[in-house]
Amino acid sequence: MMPLAGIAWNLMLLFSAVQGLPLQDGEGTQHPDLLNNPPKGSVEPVALEQLVHQAILKKDFLAQDVFFPGTTAIPTRAAPISLTEGVSDASGVLTTAVGGAFSLPPQLSTLIPPSPAPTGGPGPSPEAEEETTTTLITTTTVTTVHSPVLCNNNISESEGLLEAPEYGGSTFFGGLDCTYSVSVYLGYGVEIRVERLNLSKEEALSIEGLEEDRRFLLANETLMAEGQVIRSPTNHVAVRFQTYRATSPGAFRLRYQAFVLSCVFPPRPENGEVTVTDLHPGGAANFRCSAGFTLKGGESLVCLNISRPEWSGKPPVCAASCGGVIRNATVGRIVSPDISTSHSNNHGNNLSCHWLIEAAEGQRLHLHFERVSLDEDNDRLVVRSGSSPLSPVIYDSDIDDVPERGLLSDAQSLYIELISDNPAVPLLLSLRYEVFSESRCYEPFLAHGNFTTTDPLYSPGSLVSFFCNAGYMLEQGPPVIECVDPADPHWNESEPVCKALCGGEISEPAGVILSPDWPQNYGKGQDCVWGIHVQEDRRVLLEIEILNIRRSDALTVYDGDDLTARVLGQYMGVHQRFNLFSSANDVTLQFQSDSNDPVFSLSQGFIIHFKEVPRNDTCPALPEVPNGWKTSSHPDLIRGTVVTYQCEPGYDISGSDILTCQWDLSWSNAPPTCEKILNCADPGEIANGVRRASDPRFPIGSHVQYSCNEGYTLEGSRTLTCYNRDTGTPKWSDRIPKCVLKYEPCLNPGVPENGYQTLYKHHYQAGEALRFFCYEGFELIGEVTITCAPGHPSQWTSQPPLCKVAYEELLDDRKLEVTQTTDPSHQMEGGNIALAIFLPIILVILLIGGIYIYYTKFQGKSLFGFSFPASHSYSPITVESDFNNPLYEAGDTREYEVSI
């Protein structure tokens, strides 16, 4: 049996350890019944030891601090989340029932304590000697990963205020992630006004519109400013605020209100009209086409009341119809349909269309040919005066030329037939019809021109005067016609036509030159010459608006009044808009089309505007560029002057930044523009790591996140944000980080006495170097530079150096001072004068000294009658000897006698 003292000691340990410990089933501790009725074969001391050990573990366990998500053991830094359940009382796995955090799998380690030392009492029984008991201590490590505290809110009021969370003194370890979701009625949008905005670089604020499952960014913190109004085109927006700061989040205040959404105004179809009853949900848009055109699509659209109001369908189009009946006609057009989309096209590019135009009783029709382009071999146009295919033919394209003056019907109807059979050239047809009364003349028409009249009703006796648009000339008719014969009203002459001529002499201050037959295509084999003449003290400015000719055709511009003048330029093919200046008051233009081109394709032609401008020897002044400036190589813009454009920070130049004044006094390029830069430059990749960008174009507000490969750690900011600057180019929020090997840093070895370091800091990463210096008068003993060598832990390559007094340097400096003082070269000036003055004095002193020595040394008497108790020896102290004493300074090389 164990000694009584040992039993008492064990019981004391047991009660002190188990005090306050609930012993219940399932808690992992020994049941009380085991104390009274131990299992068969067990030994009492072993059971007692296990119970004591478990009690100690239990007490140790319960004494631990409770960890909140994202905290250490410091209670004041706990996140503001209530703890719903404490630590489990089980001695197995430790669990923390806290929302907003998650734990990594526990890491278990088993410790085997040493066996207790044997006591002095009797040993255990033989049965106990055969049974060995091992106590296992299981340690559970719980790693808590911090996650941001959520603070979401759903709002359905039509107006309100959104503000940043208030800081109540709690620590938001892991940051905040707040989403304010605002929803209003369908058919309404959300208008947000920024009343206050004060955020740091570690905070982000974004406003997004929501439409079904799609999100689209409306604004973020880089594009927001106080007073700004942001409108969502849908009835649902989300405001998200994120901060990575643990305390005192930034401030913002957004005031929102609902506003009525509307559909956009529908586009008016070409050759048609649209009327809208209301743009708000429920409103309708009605479409109709002009005569001769058919509506393709719905006649009416409704504005739908959805999250983003929109029309119930796509706007229709007005397509030229292939045939049809036009009753009670007044004024309109017949246009050739598109062969590829015509509903009557059932046989490739074949087309057969029939139109019937009917006027009211007692009226007639006038048909004018505005534009006609037919394939002579495959197209045919027939016009009949009547209402059936058997009516008399008044025009047949296979027989007649195009009637420039138009056609008159003999009755109240016209029957038009168009047939096209795989044409080789595009089919173009535009016929204008007009109804007029038999008691008056019809209204004249002049394509590419206009007219004036004395009677808007065109009654008999009225006069009409014609004139053409710029670039056209009146042909094939008089400039003035008269309505005659009251019994059968008609014009005494046909209307003239306005044509773009092939060449001519022009003596006007401004005008237009068109390619022959513009806007129709010019023919081949043409040679046209235009002469432009302005006042003698002026020159000509040519503005080429359109130049679209074949590559085998040429437009040549001469700087003079004939074809022998200097060539300003020769152009073929297609060119963008440009300008030319003449040096004098005459310019000649020549256009030649190739007559031998076997593959003659249709080309648009050209439009050239001209005007007289002051004659000078400088190029025209260049405009200032918004958000930029220009510099000139010469104050006067003479020939050869170079003008350079530059943009302000935050803007990029678009176009040519260098312009040169050419020989013809025109600029080599158009002035550029400065466009706002909305993207950051590529921050670059990192070695031994990867990056993830939210947008590969790096626009303002985008993010780039960096991470390192295994075995490396990130040094620097993990996330870079592209933010806008009012006065500069968009910039990243921080420098690009780098990935360094995972080594423990070296601690600062300290500063040597009488010395200093460069780049002083507490920790140095592996590979970093530290350099030492000594103050003046001290020399460095040891390595000047030491490096942090990687390892576990990292160590310095050598011990830090020492700073020792530099004795030799001090002596050398003093020798130098003495040498400089006694150097004869410094005493050459005035040496003769000094010798003449002091030489007699020195001789007198030597004479007196000799007499004194004679009497005192050899005669044993005092020269002046004084006696000394003893004669002391003295030794001369020279400069050489005083050099051995660093505290002694000599000023010259003379010897001194010292008597002590």
Swiss-Prot record:
Entry's transmembrane regions:
833-853
GO BP, sorted A to Z: regulation of protein kinase C signaling; synapse maturation
Matching SMART domains: CCP (SM00032), CUB (SM00042)
- How does this protein lie in the membrane? Single-pass type I membrane protein
Gene Ontology annotations for the cellular component aspect, listed alphabetically:
endoplasmic reticulum; neuronal cell body; plasma membrane
Region described as Disordered: 111-130
Cleaved signal peptide residues: 1-20
Do you know which CDD domains this protein is assigned to? CCP, CUB
- Look up keyword Cell membrane and say if it applies: yes
Family label: Belongs to the SEZ6 family.
Q: What protein name is recorded for this chain?
A: Seizure protein 6 homolog
